[in-house]
Amino acid sequence: MIKLNYLLLFLLVSFLVKAAEPDFTWTSPSQNSSQSMPCGGGDVGMNVWVENGDVLFYVAKSGAFDENNTLLKQGRFRFRLTPNPFLKANDYKQSLKVHDGYVEISANGTTVQLWADVHKPVIHVDIQNKKAISCEVHYENWRYADRLIRKNEGQQNSYKWAVPAGLTIKKDSVIVSNDAVLFFHQNPEKTIFDVTVAQQGLENVKTQLYNPLANLISGGKLWAKNLIFSHTEKGIYAGTDFQAWIFKSKKPAKQQKITIALETSQASTMAYWETSLNKTIATINPTSDRKQSIVWWNAFWNRSFIHIDGEAANLSRNYTLFRYMLGCNAHSNWPTRFNGGLFTFDPVYVDSTLKLTPDYRKWGGGTFTAQNQRLVYWPMLKSGEYDLMTPQFEFYNRLLKNAELRSKIYWNHDGACFAEQLENFGLPNPSEYGWKRPNYADKGVEYNAWLEYEWDTALEFCQMILETKSYNNADISRYKPLIESCVQFFNEHYRYLAKLRGRKELDGDGKLILFPSSACETYKMANNPASTIAALKTVLKSLGNDSLLKFIPEIPLRTVNGKTMISPGDKVIVEAPTFLDTIQCFRLSRSCPKHLFIRYGFAKISQSRRLETR
């Protein structure tokens, strides 16, 4: 009876929370794209807003990388209704129906619903009106011609601050028929992958390297039964010129449905790509697809939620919106990017001097910085988003061979060497690696004061994988080679370096000498950094690899003003006179054992010493 009462109480609380889940509603239109509302599903994101009576949205699809590794938007879409219900409307309402995963806009008897299919890359726009109205549909593209990459614009791609003179973004192709528009970006034969491979001395193994940019085509098709192509025109939005392909209703109607199907794939020809797109189109069934998408979103919210009233209501709101945007990339082949995910908007509304295209995002599109990516993915363990973590795990798994080839070519030993700022093809970002390097520099090491020897961040994702087994009893067998290779790198590489310095590859206690190394990006030329040791100890213990664990040094301690605490690095007798030589980019590396690798990394360190560590 007690168990039954608890069950009833749980069901009641669950019902109340579900019932209390609010829609996020606006009662006035927006001024520009910075006031847009997220909408999406699967691996598709839309920024939706109403401006001067027009319904607009950007479309982003995960994996749409161009030749320079910019993550491209698929275009901007504009819907203009006549007579216009949204101009000077007294009953304007725009809602993110978060529980069902769609956006609804209404005024003066007109309702527009936008939703993305969770299980296939298809967007639906459904327009309902009490009276017959006309509709204009604009497909707007700013890549209608080759675009010279301007000052600061390199931050959106892998060149960053070192954009070669004359570098362009190649134009898109746009093909119009009577009632449809086909649009796509096709990467040229040479991409940033080829440039990076040559820069980093890997041309002899180029054909063995995973290359996600080769023959990549991204785009889609928009169509509707009641549309007919009208004309093109040019304009400027948010400081960026564009060309619009404009369709109009054949006749006024009370109901209009517009569909956009997307496709991103590596195809040797445009015809093969279009075949893949048409396969998706052939599977569309709007009624059943919508039901299945709503079922998915309902289950997504029912399995995990935070709902708080009172002073913390804003915290609850922000958490829910952030989680919704994470859910929009749940079925992606690529991780949700830390710098905006699928939902960036025109940069001029962040910084008025950045009159750059909607494709712009600082910190790149195809460059993944591990210390930032981890912040997106660690919390998913607590919220039970194990399926959402898969794209991040698969990201590293796909890059494993490339990381292992780096070790084999540069140092002739085994193990996966993953950089901190990692390209989507598994090599260090070329600008961080260094365009102007002395001939004597080790080709496997970034010539970079912040990132040299910063190799331990991949271990955080290894531990995330291991934690999914602890949290969810997940089958992680496919990732075991990745994890084992990541830890084996440190064993192989630091024995290799020790033998370059002298006869012995271990210290007097039979431990690895982790020098030169880096305690996060902060303490450079460190010996036995706390962050790396904690990572190795935690992962090896979770993995059950005691044979390698015994070679890992203890987490270093130091005493300051009579108080013992965790040290960034260890002071031992090696060729470096102290445990560190320089300090860069301030991060609390000594807190990594406290906060990130909490299960095993500092089990033998007393609580008082942990508390003294700042």
Predicted regions and their residues:
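Aromatic-residue-lined binding/catalytic grooves and analogous aromatic/hydrophobic interfacial grooves
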Residues: A20-W435, I533, K541, L548-T613
